[in-house]
Amino acid sequence: MGQIVTLIQSIPEVLQEVFNVALIIVSVLCIVKGFVNLMRCGLFQLVTFLILSGRSCDSMMIDRRHNLTHVEFNLTRMFDNLPQSCSKNNTHHYYKGPSNTTWGIELTLTNTSIANETSGNFSNIGSLGYGNISNCDRTREAGHTLKWLLNELHFNVLHVTRHIGARCKTVEGAGVLIQYNLTVGDRGGEVGRHLIASLAQIIGDPKIAWVGKCFNNCSGDTCRLTNCEGGTHYNFLIIQNTTWENHCTYTPMATIRMALQRTAYSSVSRKLLGFFTWDLSDSSGQHVPGGYCLEQWAIIWAGIKCFDNTVMAKCNKDHNEEFCDTMRLFDFNQNAIKTLQLNVENSLNLFKKTINGLISDSLVIRNSLKQLAKIPYCNYTKFWYINDTITGRHSLPQCWLVHNGSYLNETHFKNDWLWESQNLYNEMLMKEYEERQGKTPLALTDICFWSLVFYTITVFLHIVGIPTHRHIIGDGCPKPHRITRNSLCSCGYYKYQRNLTNG
C-alpha cells in the first residue's frame, strides 16, 4: 500500500520532467525552423548581394561542385614580331609594326582626294613595274615587315594588280602615301566596292560601314549609287604612315586573317599539323610533364593558368575548336619564333608557311563573316570552361562570343555551359567506371551480378508460393508427391475424389 502511495506522490514530479523535455523539444524545433525560414526569406541573400554588388566575379557556380569560369589571352605578346592592328572608328584603321620597330600604317576612308591629278609627285601604281607596291614605300627605315604588309594589302587582300585608281607618292623621303579611287570601274565602281568588301572581311566589325549596301541607278553610261544602307559609300581609301601609340587596342587577328586570305580563295586541300608538344611549367618556369600551363604574359590576369592532359587530348582529337587553334599559336610561338627573334624576315616567312597548318582557316573566315553579318563571333581572346572544384578537371574551353563590341552575358549561352557541365559529369563517371573495372576482376563482377539476379528470382518465387497438391479439409497434409490428372495425391493416400471445399 505504501508503494502505491509513493507512486501516486511521484506522478507530479514525473509530469514536470515530461513537460521540461517537451519544452526543450519544442524550443529546439522552433529555433531550427526559425533558422530555416530565415535562410529561405532572402535576407542573407540580399545582404550578400549588397556586399558583392559592383564587384567582378571570375566564376559563377553552376551546382555544388561545378562553376563557370574563363581565361583571357593577351594576344599582343604572342606575336610581337608581326604587325598588330585595331579599329578606332568606321573610317580609321591602324597597323603598327613589330615590337622592335616604330612605324605605323593608317587606313582611312574619306571623300576627299589628297592626290592632285596634275601633281608630279603621284604615280599610277599600275605603271610601277607591273604594279609593284613596294616602290611606294619611301619611309627610309624600310623593313621587310612593312613591305610585306603593303604587298599583302594590295595583292592578296584587295585583290588588285593593275587597279587604275591606285596612285602613290614616289618621292624619296615622302613616307607611305597610297590612294585608291573607289569610284573608278565599270557599273558605278564595283571594283571599289569589291576592294572595300575584301578589306572589311579582314578587319571585321565595326567595319560594316566600310562595305555600304547601295543600289545602282544607271541611266545610259552614267551610274549613281542611291539608297545606301548600313553606312556611307566613300570615294577614296588612303594608306599612309603614322605613329601608332595610343590609337586603340591592338590585336594580331587581322594579320592572321590576312595570312589565311590566300588559302580561303584556294582550292588546294590541306591537313592540319598533328599533335601538341605540351608540358607543364612550375612557378619557377621549369618544365615538368603532365599538362600545359599558360605563362603569365599570355593571360590578362596575373598568375599561371594550367590545363590538364585531358583537355589537350581533346584538342589533339578534334581540331574544330577556336581554343585549340589559340593553343597551337602559343605552342608555335614558344617553340619556333623564339629561335628567330633576331631575324624578322625569317620569322615572318616561317609564320606564313606554317600558319595554314596551325589553325583552321574555316574557323577564322567563318568568324570574320559572322562579324560582318552582326552575328556573335569569336575574337580568340576570351574563353569559358567548366571547372570541377573537387577534382580540378576542366572541360574543353569554348570561345566567349562577342556581339556589338561586347561579350555576351552568361544567360545568352546558358544551354551551352549546362551541356558542358553534364558532359563533364559523364566523363568523370565513365573514368571512374573504367578505373573500377580495371581494379575488380571481371569474373568476380559477373558472379556478383548473377547471384543477385538469382536471389531476386528466388524471393519472387517464395512470395508467390506455387501450390504442389490439394489439402482436403479434415485430413493431414500429405508428404511431397506428384499430382494426378484428377488433382489427387499420387501416393494413394486419397483414393476417391470428394466434393469438399478445397483449401
Curated annotation (Swiss-Prot):
Site note Cleavage, residues: 58-59, 273-274
Gene Ontology CC annotations of this record: host cell endoplasmic reticulum membrane; host cell Golgi membrane; host cell plasma membrane; membrane; viral envelope; virion membrane
Molecular-function annotations in GO: metal ion binding
Record's keyword terms, sorted: Disulfide bond, Fusion of virus membrane with host endosomal membrane, Fusion of virus membrane with host membrane, Glycoprotein, Host cell membrane, Host endoplasmic reticulum, Host Golgi apparatus, Host membrane, Host-virus interaction, Lipoprotein, Membrane, Metal-binding, Myristate, Transmembrane, Transmembrane helix, Viral attachment to host cell, Viral envelope protein, Viral penetration into host cytoplasm, Virion, Virus endocytosis by host, Virus entry into host cell, Zinc
Residues exposed to the Extracellular side: 2-17, 59-446
UniProt: Zn(2+) 2 binding residues: 469, 471, 477
Origin: domain of life: Viruses
Transmembrane segments: 18-33, 447-467
Pfam families on file: Arena_glycoprot
S-S bonds: 86-248, 293-306, 315-324, 378-399
Positions of Zn(2+) 1 binding: 57, 481, 489, 491
Topology Cytoplasmic: residue spans: 34-58, 468-503
Lipid-conjugated positions (N-myristoyl glycine): 2
InterPro entries: Arena_glycoprot, Arena_glycoprot_zinc-bd
Any GO BP: fusion of virus membrane with host endosome membrane
Residues modified by glycosylation: 89, 111, 181, 241, 379, 387, 404, 409
Annotated site residue numbers, Important for GP-C-mediated membrane fusion: 33
Similarity comment text for this entry: Belongs to the arenaviridae GPC protein family.
Protein name according to UniProt: Pre-glycoprotein polyprotein GP complex
